Swiss-Prot record:
Protein name (Swiss-Prot/TrEMBL): Protein FAM107B
Source superkingdom: Eukaryota
Compositional bias ranges of the Basic and acidic residues kind: 52-78
One Pfam family cited in the UniProt record for this chain: DUF1151
Length: 131
């Protein structure tokens, strides 16, 4: 490569160009990564050498192991968690029953509602007379 002619001239008015800093080479993380990739390539552990099927199988195995660990963690619930789940289920059942009763009352014919109101007023009048 030819040397630029401004290097030979000792003109003090010229600003000498400085070599640009390569951020990739100065980055310590990038150097470590590059060194690791070179070592893996020499050993034959390069990720590009694996066939696609093998990559997919390894990913499935990893996913399976993770799923098994999560299931085991769920199975190992403490007594407190079990009791809380039971209470939550009971509360949900009570809410469902209340909703069913409300729906039945809303869907009931008008004469059934009036009959219930008459009974209540009759009972209230009877209690007021007894007092």
């Amino acid at each position: 490569m030819a040397e630029p002619d401004y290097i030979e001239d000792d003109n003090p008015e010229l600003i000498r160009p400085q070599k640009l800093i390569n951020p990739v080479k100065t980055s310590r993380n990038h150097q470590d990564l590059h060194r690791e990739l070179l070592m893996n390539q020499k050993r034959g552990l390069a990720p590009q050498n694996k066939p696609e099927l093998q990559k997919v199988m390894e990913k499935r195995k990893r996913d399976q192991v993770i799923k098994q660990k999560e299931e085991e963690a769920q199975k190992k619930k403490s007594d407190l968690e079990i009791e809380l789940l039971k209470r939550q289920q009971k509360l949900e059942q009570l809410e469902l029953e209340k909703q069913k009763l409300q729906e039945e009352q809303e869907n009931a014919p008008e004469f059934v509602k009036v009959k219930g109101n008459l009974r209540r007023t009759g009972q209230e009048v009877a209690q007021a007379q007894e007092s």
